[in-house]
């Protein structure tokens, strides 16, 4: 999928990986990049506009833990202005197993809500045009880091939810896939806490392993969006993007 002249909504597009991804996206000659983020960063928005003045970059303050009704209201505003949106990127995430409810709210519930809200506009059963959802997960969604079980479980939920959305593409017209980074040099890794403090040095231990840069992540995120493979589970580790073949152990038969 060529991104030229596309309209993209990017949840958490100003964070470490998010900002580098936004930089890569505007280089693709989008029509509009709409960034929803909790923290305003006027300097970053100005930088994105300067990278490619042909792209309209818009910022809306947004906390992904806001109720579904509020998310829907915001999307109504965005769709009223843009008329169409082609891609939704769900990129919000925290890594702090001290904050159990917030971890689940940010990493999973918020993603479900933005997906649910945008279906009001995309669902072909309602006359919508369909669309593409890129959900940013984590390799811990395949194999948990046991010292952060809440974070790992929230990312496993992202993979499971996205697989279901992908299988509904023939019903809704909406395709979906996950991109799941390995250990990346961001503030997320430096600041997180383990569950019940079972490992006080978990951040340091992770950083002792090979990592990847936020730029490498960003470039591969955009590559995955351009590939637009419905149902793909992408592993993005050490700067390499590769598909994961999920093993089926049970079939509902539905």
Curated annotation (Swiss-Prot):
<dbReference type="InterPro" id="IPR020904">
    <property type="entry name" value="Sc_DH/Rdtase_CS"/>
</dbReference>
<comment type="subunit">
    <text>Homodimer.</text>
</comment>
<dbReference type="GO" id="GO:0048149">
    <property type="term" value="P:behavioral response to ethanol"/>
</dbReference>
<dbReference type="GO" id="GO:0019431">
    <property type="term" value="P:acetyl-CoA biosynthetic process from ethanol"/>
</dbReference>
<feature type="binding site">
    <location>
        <position position="138"/>
    </location>
    <ligand>
        <name>substrate</name>
    </ligand>
</feature>
<dbReference type="GO" id="GO:0046164">
    <property type="term" value="P:alcohol catabolic process"/>
</dbReference>
<dbReference type="GO" id="GO:0006117">
    <property type="term" value="P:acetaldehyde metabolic process"/>
</dbReference>
<dbReference type="GO" id="GO:0004029">
    <property type="term" value="F:aldehyde dehydrogenase (NAD+) activity"/>
</dbReference>
<protein>
    <recommendedName>
        <fullName>Alcohol dehydrogenase</fullName>
        <ecNumber>1.1.1.1</ecNumber>
    </recommendedName>
</protein>
<feature type="active site" description="Proton acceptor">
    <location>
        <position position="151"/>
    </location>
</feature>
<dbReference type="InterPro" id="IPR002425">
    <property type="entry name" value="ADH_Drosophila-type"/>
</dbReference>
<dbReference type="InterPro" id="IPR002347">
    <property type="entry name" value="SDR_fam"/>
</dbReference>
<feature type="binding site">
    <location>
        <begin position="9"/>
        <end position="32"/>
    </location>
    <ligand>
        <name>NAD(+)</name>
    </ligand>
</feature>
<keyword id="KW-0560">Oxidoreductase</keyword>
<dbReference type="GO" id="GO:0006734">
    <property type="term" value="P:NADH metabolic process"/>
</dbReference>
<comment type="similarity">
    <text>Belongs to the short-chain dehydrogenases/reductases (SDR) family.</text>
</comment>
<dbReference type="GO" id="GO:0042803">
    <property type="term" value="F:protein homodimerization activity"/>
</dbReference>
<dbReference type="GO" id="GO:0004022">
    <property type="term" value="F:alcohol dehydrogenase (NAD+) activity"/>
</dbReference>
<dbReference type="InterPro" id="IPR036291">
    <property type="entry name" value="NAD(P)-bd_dom_sf"/>
</dbReference>
<dbReference type="GO" id="GO:0005829">
    <property type="term" value="C:cytosol"/>
</dbReference>
<keyword id="KW-0520">NAD</keyword>
<dbReference type="Pfam" id="PF00106">
    <property type="entry name" value="adh_short"/>
</dbReference>
